[in-house]
UniProtKB/Swiss-Prot annotation:
Key word Ribonucleoprotein present: no
Keyword RNA-binding: yes
Subcellular location as annotated: Cytoplasm
Pfam families: DND1_DSRM, RRM_1
Source organism (scientific name): Homo sapiens (Human)
InterPro entries named in the record: HnRNP_R/Q_splicing_fac, Nucleotide-bd_a/b_plait_sf, RBD_domain_sf, RBM46_DSR, RBM46_RRM1, RBM46_RRM2, RBM46_RRM3, RRM_dom
Subunit composition and interactions: Interacts with YTHDC2, MEIOC, MOV10, CNOT6L, DDX4, UPF1 and PABPC1.
Its biological purpose: Essential for male and female fertility, playing a crucial role in regulating germ cell development by ensuring the proper progression of meiosis prophase I. Regulates mitotic-to-meiotic transition in spermatogenesis by forming a complex with MEIOC and YTHDC2 which recognizes and down-regulates mitotic transcripts for a successful meiotic entry. Required for normal synaptonemal complex formation during meiosis, binding meiotic cohesin subunit mRNAs containing GCCUAU/GUUCGA motifs in their 3'UTRs regions and positively regulating their translation.
Any one GO CC term of the record: cytoplasm
Name recorded for this polypeptide: Probable RNA-binding protein 46
Length: 533
């Protein structure tokens, strides 16, 4: 059967066959001199371009392109993106059917060209009524490694990771807030390339891999967001980490004022890090060079310029559930509460998307409200007649999942315990009767929550991820470049496989691990029909 598409060069309904598509691509290659090859579900145009000498362009030169019409190909797309500058490589994600997957990555030869592409082509009308989205692509080269023995030093972790994975460049380890001789139980491992990081993740992700006798947790770390040089030139706030919990704001202000009395405007400290605000940038830069590596109350501190946060990107980061080695910096500088990757943390929202595979991330679907006018015609429907991308709550997704598989609704069992400081902590156990006698009799996360809503949401997230359920399987905007091909199944039944899972850090209210010696106490059965979400 011939492939057909509408020619977007003039907006007419001009039908092109597969042979014509092939001819158009060959003509593009002949005209530009670029090579084209298809591998691993993507078609690469260039990389490098003709006559290129030297290494590939640095990070920050690539953009992500979303919402591409599925029947549009390089012969139409490349000329559009060449308007911003010289293309080093154009990667179009492809389906087995021959259609594209709705998104692509364009690498330019300079960062300036990439920024220009974002400015002039984001929300560009590529065809009548069809607008593409263009944003920076973050080439993720870092993995989060959790459940590391706290007594291990950076050198030991680096040596061990080099033994079990290839391409390790560095390891980032932060000391404990309460005991500087120990680490925080996690580390960030940086690899020489995204491919090396992806291969390492594939090797370590099953949940059975152990280091020093401990089963480790592995996930993508959110790469640190790059802030343009013009913005950074205006920053007059320093980010100070590795402070003692007992160190006061007054002590920090006094120490940073030593090199120039009166230079510090104010200090905001949260746990073991702080933001030091200066009256002018010159004093901030001078203080950074003087104070970095200095000791305050016996702790050697790290001092850098604070990165101003992009509120939209931070919100998107919360929705994605991504973890960043500098997340404290980005979130708190925007007057948010503190975040601790994969451990105790406070973030303002529950996640809308829980797939931990983010590298790079397409733009999220915007959640909107619309005016409800008097007289608007309404039609009663069942929630089960909707598609899964209409839901954001994991509790709703789990109920939907069970219904689509003709299973009985999930059963939620609530447990509680009391923390050392007297707080009531909650956790749900979920039983799915249809598979209770199978390989997994129940699902229960190893984190405790302080609110009922968070406990129920976390348990549902954990269960869905164990069931290998993709939250946005029907939404083209949710496709991730590193996601595996979805399991096939009948239209009425969602595919099910049970698998071990080291789940990512969830932006929930503060959670506490079950592995803290506490005894689970009171049990309460909550009907699945109760509206706790």
């Amino acid at each position: 059967m011939n492939e057909e598409n509408i020619d977007g060069t003039n907006g007419c309904s001009k039908v092109r066959t597969g042979i014509q598509n092939e001819a158009a691509l060959l003509a593009l290659m002949e005209k530009t001199g670029y090579n084209m090859v298809q591998e691993n579900g993507q078609r690469k145009f260039g990389g490098p371009p003709p006559g290129w000498e030297g290494p590939p362009p640095p990070r920050g030169c690539e953009v992500f392109v979303g919402k591409i019409p599925r029947d549009m190909y390089e012969d139409e797309l490349v000329p559009v993106f060449e308007r911003a500058g010289k293309i080093y490589e154009f990667r179009l994600m492809m389906e087995f059917s021959g259609e594209n997957r709705g998104y692509a990555f364009v690498m330019y030869t300079t960062k300036e060209e990439a920024q220009l592409a974002i400015r002039i082509l984001n929300n560009y009308e590529i065809r009548p009524g069809k607008f593409i989205g263009v944003c920076v692509s973050l080439d993720n080269c870092r993995l989060f490694i959790g459940a590391i023995p706290k007594e291990k030093k950076k050198e030991e972790i680096l040596d061990e990771m080099k033994k079990v994975t290839e391409g390790v460049v560095d390891v980032i380890v932060y000391p404990s807030a309460t005991d500087k001789t120990k680490n925080r139980g996690f580390a960030f491992v940086e690899y020489e390339s995204h491919r090396a990081a992806a291969m390492a993740r594939r090797k370590l992700i099953p949940g059975t891999f152990q280091l020093w006798g401990h089963t480790i947790q592995v996930d993508w770390a959110d790469p640190e967001k790059e802030v343009d040089e013009e913005t950074m030139q205006r920053v007059k706030v320093l980010y100070v980490r590795n402070l003692m919990i007992s160190t006061t704001e007054e002590t920090i202000k006094a120490e940073f004022n030593k090199f120039k009395p009166g230079a510090v405007e104010r200090v905001k400290k949260l746990r073991d890090y702080a933001f030091v605000h200066f009256f002018n940038r010159e004093d901030a830069v001078a203080a950074m060079s003087v104070m970095n590596g200095k000791c305050i109350d016996g702790a050697s501190i790290e001092v850098t310029l604070a990165k101003p946060v992009n509120k939209e990107n931070t919100w998107r980061q919360h929705l994605n559930g991504q973890i960043s080695p500098n997340s404290e910096n980005l979130i708190v500088f925007a007057n948010k509460e503190e975040s601790h990757p994969k451990t105790l943390g406070k973030l303002p929202t529950l996640p809308a998307r829980l797939n931990g595979q983010h590298s790079p991330s397409p733009p999220e679907v915007e959640r909107c409200t619309y005016p409800f006018y008097p007289g608007t015609k309404l039609t009663p429907i069942s929630m089960y007649s909707l598609k899964s991308n209409h839901f954001n709550s994991a509790v709703m997704h789990l109920d939907y999942y069970c219904n689509k598989n003709n299973w009985a609704p999930p059963e939620y069992y609530l447990y509680s315990t009391t923390s050392q400081d007297g707080k009531v902590l909650l956790v749900y156990k979920i039983v799915i009767p249809a598979i209770a006698n199978g390989s997994q009799s129940y699902f229960m996360p190893d984190k405790l929550c302080t609110t009922l809503e968070d406990a129920k949401e976390l348990a549902a997230q954990f269960t869905l991820l164990h069931l290998d359920y993709n939250f946005h399987r029907s939404s083209i905007n949710s496709l991730s470049p590193v996601s595996a091909t979805l399991s096939s199944g009948t239209p009425s039944v969602l595919p099910y496989t049970s698998r071990p899972y080291s789940y990512p850090g969830y932006p929930l209210s503060p959670t506490i691990s079950l592995a803290n010696g506490s005894h689970v106490g009171q049990r309460l059965c909550i009907s699945n029909q109760a509206s706790f979400f």
